[in-house]
């Protein structure tokens, strides 16, 4: 999930303090505050082009909007036990929201339309974040002392495969032309075209990955004071900020 998405005819952006803004162009002075709830914590956004879904750290855990202006809370089923819906992605069966499963919570949330949500048992405990979809499979990262990369064609319980484990933490990730690209805290990257077979590229980045996204035909990775650009997730070119 992102903190800024292009939805229909406008940008929608979220903040750590529970605010949601929209803008037709993204330029300074064009942003309008649409929602403000400081108690909700961090927001993450995903859109399928029809409806925008927002997940958050407090109840109600899911909000939806067709236009970015009016936001409607959606019910997470009783017994879900969700303490935090950490992130969300739009993909094959609809929307997949990952959760903080470090304690009693042992569910993902899956929805075909963003409105009705169904619990799906996770394959392991842990902090599940950065769900991704490449057009064929979901990939979700399980963080902690090590990174576990789990893959599923549907997001349904019982369909997840542990595809890769590493002592390196891979918190930043994106999808570029169907390829999964993960950035590590040690300047390495991981790439995969199918979500199951992963290739390690040691020292591919000029520093640790602080943020990563895809824009057009390139992936962009932010570092402290610089950023780097790649067309394949393997070879990166560093540039100064500003």
What are these regions (language model features)?
Residues 23-24, 65, 111, 152-153, ...:
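Conserved Ser/Thr-centered positions that define the repeating blades of beta-propeller domains
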Residues 1-7, 39-48, 81-91, 125-134, ...:
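Repeated scaffold domains used in trafficking and secretory/extracellular systems
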